[in-house]
Amino acid sequence: TILMNDKKLNIKVIAPVLLSFFVMSFVDLVGIGVDRVSNDMDLSATLAQLIPSAAFLWFFLLSVPVGVLQSRLGKRFMLNAGMVVTAAGLLVPYLFYTFEMVLAGFALLGIGNTIVQVSANPLLVDVVPGNRAPSFLSFSQFVKAIGSMLGAPLALVFASRFGDWKLLFLVFGVVSILSVIWLGSVKIDEVVKQETRVSL
């Protein structure tokens, strides 16, 4: 093990945190899902546009409250919570494929993604040596990009080989759950910042 900036480079701890960036990319399935759900359910253009709105509205509403909760409950707790919600958002439309359940699932996917986005970067900074943080943050975006690129081709494979593109939801939902289990199994020493309270 190498000691840098008083912190060891521990791949066993870093790897599950990096996997959360792969999970972060799963929100891009909304883009893949819009056309396919519209075709499957013969939706009007107006109804189809509700699908991405259900997912992407949440970052603007929840990013600040999630940050406040994170300072109280911890980064790993919130990151795991976000990935659990992400898994639920993927499994709901797979198991219950109706328009209402797709909207509910994609809303959960958006909420989970918001939590993961808020929590993943700070936790990654906590688990890597300080002088390596910029390079690992850059690499985390590469991991996220891989997940984003895999969605469309996997949907095509599942549709052509198994006749069901929605298997993508099942596979990525299982990956989210495995990521939660892996992250929960490692010991992480989080950096806790002291809050300065302002009273009027």
Language-model features, listed with the residues they occupy:
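MFS 12-TM fold signature
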Residues: 85-90, 109, 175-179
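C-terminal membrane-cytosol helix-exit motif in multi-pass small-molecule transporters
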Residues: 168, 173-193
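Cytoplasmic helix-loop-helix junction between adjacent transmembrane helices
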Residues: 105-142
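Short hydrophobic/aromatic, small-residue-rich stretches within specific transmembrane helices
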Residues: 49-56
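Conserved MFS/SLC helix-loop-helix module at the cytosolic interface between two early adjacent transmembrane helices
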Residues: 61-100
